[in-house]
Amino acid sequence: MPKRGLFVGRFQPVHNGHIKALEFVFSQVDEVIIGIGSAQASHTLKNPFTTSERMEMLIRALDEAGLEKRYYLIPLPDINFNAIWSTYVQSMVPRFDVVFTGNSLVAQLFRERGYEVIVQPMFRKDILSATEIRKRMVEGEPWEELVPKSVAEFIKEIKGVERIKMLATNLENSEKELQAPIRIPEF
């Protein structure tokens, strides 16, 4: 029976840190289950891309990295209930033997369920962060070098930068509306 590892992320967007981590994961197990977290979320500043877009990014990036197709992509909608989250994930994915994560809460939740947890190396977390990449997109700063070439091309194909800028503008306008004084109409 092949040894399977679980790796969960939101991938908003897929970046070079994800790929470096996945290269490590692939080197440790026979098959990898890649859980796509917050699968229900899209078109928000924190989660701008749809699940299918994130799946496409992963497929292209893993192919570009030369990683064998020894993986499953599984969407994982949020349940916002940490105490049972690891049980929920276990019910949503094929059998796995080990969990790879850089998130201390994820590590704790799976250890409590008796799983082996390996904290994979983190790569340039200061800039290889989806939050930083989205921020750079909004501010018009260079971001392409932080993601695989195939992901940068895909984001451009779907006009992802324009979407993120629009979401940021909408959020900024909403915040201004919330801070505006309330005017009671005169009758």
UniProtKB/Swiss-Prot annotation:
One of its GO terms (cellular component) is cytoplasm. It comes from the Archaea. InterPro entries: Cyt_trans-like, NMN_Atrans_arc, Rossmann-like_a/b/a_fold. Its main location: cytoplasm. It catalyses: beta-nicotinamide D-ribonucleotide + ATP + H(+) = diphosphate + NAD(+). Keywords: ATP-binding, Cytoplasm, NAD, Nucleotide-binding, Nucleotidyltransferase, Pyridine nucleotide biosynthesis, Transferase. It is an enzyme of class 2 (transferase). The keyword Metal-binding does not apply. It is found in: Cytoplasm. PANTHER family: BIFUNCTIONAL NMN ADENYLYLTRANSFERASE_NUDIX HYDROLASE, PHOSPHOPANTETHEINE ADENYLYLTRANSFERASE. This is Nicotinamide-nucleotide adenylyltransferase. It comes from Thermococcus onnurineus (strain NA1).
